[in-house]
Amino acid sequence: LTFDAVAALPTGEATKERPTLFKTMIGTLNHNYLIDLVWQAHLEGRDHGFQARNIVLHHDLAELWKAQQAINRWYIDWSGRQTEQSLDETVHFQFIGGDPGAMTRGDILLHVVNHATYHRGWIAEMFFQVPARNPTTDLPVYLQSLGHGSDSEPRHSG
């Protein structure tokens, strides 16, 4: 929903500098993507190679969307392979600033989801500066757009 809404904005609005930490909508979306890559590396036990959180890896929204979809698929596939035991495993890592850190795999996954949601809210707020109708960031609305909760969907018991 967010990428579609940003793509529908008038030309230049996604890259227009605004009074926000990552400067632009594209910058904020890139930050989300970069952080997804950082935590993927931590989960895989490898170095991510990033020295900053504000690097624009993809200046083009369509390219960024493709890259974001790829990392989203990785997280979906990775999540599907996890067990309660594996999600409780502690991962030791270094924050981008160099400080040591440790979190369970489950906490990392929770952080990745919450982090992206948080910054999508920043982007939605920037829409008021355009001005344009902001994309919804509510999970129930998103799930409804996917058809979740409809009578044709299988119900889970338990």
Model-predicted segments: where are they?
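Short secondary-structure junctions
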Residues: A8-P10, Q82-T83
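Short, contiguous alpha-helical
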Residues: F3, E13-N54, F95-G158
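Carboxylate-rich helix-loop segments that flank metal/cofactor sites and access channels
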Residues: E84-G97
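Helix-adjacent hinge/juxtasegments
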Residues: R46-L87
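N-terminal leader/capping segments at the start of a protein or of a new domain
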Residues: L1, A5-A8
